[in-house]
């Protein structure tokens, strides 16, 4: 089954490949190293310095009266064509026509470059035997003149060249003199918007196409105009109006106008063509879906081939498509028959174009010339009825396309990187003038030479690719290092056997045949099948055959049969000091190439070299260097150049290998990328897992262990003894599990630099409902602070004794005591006391605080009975401005009750007893530590405890907050009617881990940010009896 499927695929591929014709190979190839010996014209006169050159900008060339006219920028050169092929070409005369300075200034004012503001000769025609008609752009102000042919002197007045010559040299134009009238096609405005087919001069009225009507002309590019019969035919390409829905589709067209057209009536088509019709040219490869060549490049004049009048045209693919060119032949009778067929119309702007029925076509038929045999009663076109004129105005397009001869291209060239743009035809080639040879010029400076074959039907049936020539001479034609290889025009002179090829910077004279290359080798001369070459018996060499030559010669154009002819060994002929030979008998010794050479009559084919084993690469043997064989004879290689094709098999193998290697490399790259991503994902997952485990044991707050509940000394201190988090896994510690949570720091070896700071602690909304035990402690502490008189020195190691610290389930101590060097600890920390000792110490402190409170009360009562009232009044008149902080002890999303925080109500005062308040912001924690430690050690049960002071939290600045602060207050009611409420503040502490070894007292890290909130005074919520105040 598989072999059958493979055979079917091969058959389909063969059929598909046979659908499109393959390019033929030339019999002979002439490279630039050989053609550089041809004469070149660069604008010099005989005897002038050839090193100095000026830019020519050649626009066109024309042969008239055995003289070659070269139309360039600001000049027209004349060259004598009756010279040999070995002589240099010089101009015999030079006509200079430069633009006036006023026109140049106007051109520059219009925004054009100075190189564009010249007079480019675009129209050069023979008006009659004595007059030369010339038109130029004249710095974007086209003008025309008449010159005498013999002297090139101007005569008559200069007149406007509008509608006869374009404004810009880049715009295409055509012009033709017929019966003394000038038929031109170009643009009529500066912006090249209005395209026109125009008739002027002569005794007939001036006519033009309808202005700005896309049905008549839509962005045309004019190529050629020919005079045939009663009509003038214009060949051009334009945007197809019938295919507007498909975008800008370009079609080749041919249009006709009658020579005797006098225009329409005063009502319809006045001073406009009444015979203008246009049709599409069809040049396509037939098949189920035709492959069209729509870009018309060049058209010949009407030539007669085998008794028929035809025109040959070159077409190409669009410039944004794959390169390809074709040559199609059209019979003039077929063109005339299309204009007698059906018309095409569009009934509405959105509808498609459809044929017009014959019954709707008015009489007389539009497009016919007045005064013809079918329209004898209409002497001129002015007499046509309005129906005919209106119909021709709205229906200029024909429905059918002009078919090419044999309904397919006569020649194809698709496997090259250039397009064919020019054409020249010799329809009387050979000594008997019975052959047709076509020369095609490309945009790369390459000339292709073909022989038209006549089939059994008596007409063109194909072509024979005779020769390929690279005629551009970079040494002489390049200007300022720029090589412009576009061929601007070609003119063939059969009498001199020359083809003049014009580039923008030079003109090269190329012989029609290279017969001297064959020398004395008869086999190669016959095998070349060139109508211009033949084997001359008298001289025993291959020579050029002029028309009607009387020399005895041998040719075989049809078959090129070389049977019975001997091989050509070491035969060469010298030309201009260079020896040449087509057959490399001594330089290529392989048998394969030799057999191929002999089978074609001595013509070398590069396929033989490719198939020959052990042969050298022909692509590398294209250099222009001559080489010398063993016998001293200089040979030259004429193999294909680097821009030729490679074998299909090699190309297929290269494509397959490239595909396989690309697939392998792509797989490797994809595997590496996937593996790298997989590793990255694994690393990220492992890091997230480790981070999750580390977060489970993260600390919400860390505090020092030593000196927490009373005893600041330890018998056996150990370093780095600190408390573990008081909040474990987001829950507050309770008395039942407090002992479990207090762990030695030496078991963890925590890094002190990693301890949390107030800035890095997330904030949560704090609940406002306080705990009852914490509220009582705050109230008692507030009373003690309010009743103090003096403050101890800043450096005193006395610490105030708080009211009894209650071990409530939600209570967190606000201060911890750390060992200091002044007490002899030598930077060591004490062990954590046991839970029972902590409870006992708390009880002792409670009793001491109660006794101290009673002592202060009695002391105040003995001094002033109304002291408490005054104190309350002072307190109410000047409440302390202490900021309220809000913080959290857990992760984001959780909230803690206010009772779970360590709170303290502080009152700040001055040395005057309870009358003024002053905020105190210690500059560092060491000062506060010394002060509080000393107060606690020395003044626990004495009356001096009235001087106890509550300082601000650690880590604050030296200055108080500038904005008013909100305070949490309680009310103190007096027994007097005028008693005032005392508002006291509760201030949390902020602690920074700056220097643990130097501080004797360390507060727990504050859980509230240091930002000044808005001021707020809470209402009185807790009442105190009068006897609770200081009396």
UniProtKB/Swiss-Prot annotation:
Record topology, Cytoplasmic segments: 671-1031
Biased composition (Polar residues): 921-931, 971-998, 1019-1031
Keywords on record: Cell membrane, Developmental protein, Differentiation, Disulfide bond, Glycoprotein, Membrane, Neurogenesis, Phosphoprotein, Signal, Transmembrane, Transmembrane helix
GO cellular component: axon; membrane; plasma membrane
UniProt-annotated glycosylation sites, renumbered to this chain: 33, 49, 65, 282, 434, 461
Places the protein is found: Cell membrane
UniProt-recorded name of the protein: Semaphorin-6A
Origin species: Mus musculus
Source organism phylogeny: Eukaryota, Metazoa, Chordata, Craniata, Vertebrata
Encoding gene (name): Sema6a
């Amino acid at each position: 089954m598989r072999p059958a499927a493979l055979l079917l695929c091969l058959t389909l591929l063969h059929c598909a490949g046979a659908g499109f014709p393959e390019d033929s190979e030339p019999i002979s190839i002439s490279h630039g190293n050989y053609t550089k010996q041809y004469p070149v014209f660069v604008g010099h006169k005989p005897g002038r310095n050839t090193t100095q050159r000026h830019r020519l900008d050649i626009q066109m060339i024309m042969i008239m009266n055995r003289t070659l006219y070269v139309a360039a920028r600001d000049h027209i050169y004349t060259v004598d064509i009756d010279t040999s092929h070995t002589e240099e070409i010089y101009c015999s005369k030079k006509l200079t026509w430069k633009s006036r300075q006023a026109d140049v200034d106007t051109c520059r004012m219009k925004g054009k470059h100075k190189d564009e503001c010249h007079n480019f000769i675009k129209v050069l025609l023979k008006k009659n035997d004595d007059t030369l008609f010339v038109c130029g752009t004249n710095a974007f102000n086209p003008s025309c003149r008449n010159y005498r042919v013999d002297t090139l002197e101007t005569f008559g007045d200069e007149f406007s060249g509008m509608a006869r010559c374009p404004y810009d040299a880049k715009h295409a134009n055509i012009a033709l003199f017929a019966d003394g009238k000038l038929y031109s096609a170009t643009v009529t405005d500066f912006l090249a918007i209005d395209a026109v087919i125009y008739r002027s001069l002569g005794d007939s009225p001036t006519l033009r196409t309808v202005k700005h009507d896309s049905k008549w002309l839509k962005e045309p590019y004019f190529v050629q105009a020919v005079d045939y019969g009663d009509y003038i035919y214009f060949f051009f390409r334009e945007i197809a109006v019938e295919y507007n829905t498909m975008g800008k589709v370009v079609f080749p067209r041919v249009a006709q106008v009658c020579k005797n057209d006098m225009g329409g009536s005063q009502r319809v088509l006045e001073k406009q063509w009444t015979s203008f019709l246009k049709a599409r040219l069809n040049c396509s490869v037939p098949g189920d879906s035709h492959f069209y060549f729509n870009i018309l490049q060049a058209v010949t004049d009407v030539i007669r081939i085998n008794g028929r009048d035809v025109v040959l045209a070159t077409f190409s693919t669009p410039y944004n498509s794959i390169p390809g060119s074709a040559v199609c032949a059209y019979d003039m009778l077929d063109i005339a028959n299309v204009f007698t067929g059906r018309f095409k119309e569009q009934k509405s702007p959105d509808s498609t174009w459809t044929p017009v029925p014959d019954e709707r076509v008015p009489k007389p038929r539009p497009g016919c010339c007045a005064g013809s045999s079918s329209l004898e009663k209409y002497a001129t076109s002015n007499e046509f009825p309005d129906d005919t004129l209106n119909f021709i105005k709205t229906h200029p397009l024909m429905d059918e396309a002009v078919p090419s001869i044999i309904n397919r291209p006569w020649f194809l060239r698709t496997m090259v990187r250039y397009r064919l743009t020019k054409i020249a035809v010799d329809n009387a080639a050979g000594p008997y003038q019975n052959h047709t040879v076509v020369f095609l010029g490309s945009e790369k400076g390459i000339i292709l030479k073909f022989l038209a074959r006549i089939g059994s039907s008596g007409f063109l049936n194909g072509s024979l690719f005779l020769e390929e020539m690279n005629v551009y001479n970079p040494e002489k034609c390049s200007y300022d290092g720029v090589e412009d290889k576009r061929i601007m025009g070609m003119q063939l002179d059969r009498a001199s056997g020359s083809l003049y090829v014009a580039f923008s910077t030079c003109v090269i004279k190329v012989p029609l045949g290279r017969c001297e290359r064959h020398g004395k080798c008869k086999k190669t001369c016959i095998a070349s099948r060139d109508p211009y070459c033949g084997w001359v018996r008298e001289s025993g060499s291959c020579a050029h055959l002029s028309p009607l030559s009387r020399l005895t010669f041998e040719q075989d154009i049809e078959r090129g049969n070389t049977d019975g002819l001997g091989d050509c060994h070491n035969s060469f002929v010298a030309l201009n000091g260079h020896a040449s030979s087509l057959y490399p008998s001594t330089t290529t010794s392989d048998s394969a190439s030799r057999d191929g050479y002999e089978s074609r009559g001595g013509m070398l084919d590069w396929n033989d070299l490719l198939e020959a084993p052990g042969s050298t690469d022909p692509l590398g043997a294209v250099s222009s260097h001559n080489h010398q064989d063993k016998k001293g004879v200089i040979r030259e290689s004429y193999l294909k150049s680097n821009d030729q094709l490679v074998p299909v098999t090699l190309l297929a193998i290269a494509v397959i290998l490239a595909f396989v290697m690309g697939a392998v490399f792509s797989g490797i790259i994809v595997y590496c990328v996937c593996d790298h991503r997989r590793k990255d994902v694994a690393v990220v997952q492992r890091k997230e897992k480790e981070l999750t485990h580390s977060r489970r044991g993260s600390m919400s707050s860390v505090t020092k262990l030593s000196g927490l509940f009373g005893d600041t000394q330890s018998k056996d201190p150990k370093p780095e003894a600190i408390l573990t988090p008081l909040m474990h896994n987001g829950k507050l510690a309770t008395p039942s599990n407090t002992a479990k949570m207090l762990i030695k720091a030496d078991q963890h070896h925590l890094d002190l630099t990693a301890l949390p700071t107030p800035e890095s602690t997330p904030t949560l909304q704090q609940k406002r409902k306080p705990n009852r035990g914490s509220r009582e402690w705050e109230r008692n502490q507030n009373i003690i602070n309010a009743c103090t008189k003096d403050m101890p020195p800043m450096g005193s190691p006395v610490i105030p004794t708080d009211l009894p610290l209650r071990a409530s389930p939600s209570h967190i101590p606000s201060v911890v005591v750390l060992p200091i060097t002044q007490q002899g600890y030598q930077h060591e920390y004490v062990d954590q006391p046991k839970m029972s000792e902590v409870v006992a110490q708390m009880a002792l402190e409670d009793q001491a605080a109660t006794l101290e409170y009673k002592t202060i009360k009695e002391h105040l009562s003995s001094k002033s009975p109304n002291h408490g009232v005054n104190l309350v009044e002072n307190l109410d008149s000047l409440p302390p401005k202490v900021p309220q902080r809000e913080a959290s002890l857990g992760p984001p999303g959780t909230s803690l009750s206010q009772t779970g925080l360590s709170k303290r109500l502080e009152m700040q005062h001055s040395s005057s007893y309870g009358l003024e308040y002053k905020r105190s912001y210690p500059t560092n924690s060491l000062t506060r530590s010394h002060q509080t430690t000393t107060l606690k050690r020395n003044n626990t049960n004495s009356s001096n405890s009235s001087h106890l002071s509550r300082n601000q939290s650690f880590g604050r600045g030296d200055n108080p907050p500038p904005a008013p602060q909100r305070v949490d207050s309680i009310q103190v009611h007096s027994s007097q009617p005028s008693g005032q409420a005392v508002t006291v503040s509760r201030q949390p502490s902020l602690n920074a881990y700056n220097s643990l070894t130097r501080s004797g007292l360390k507060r727990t890290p504050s859980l509230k940010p240091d930002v000044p909130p808005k001021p707020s005074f809470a209402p009185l919520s807790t009442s105190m009896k009068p006897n609770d105040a200081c009396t």
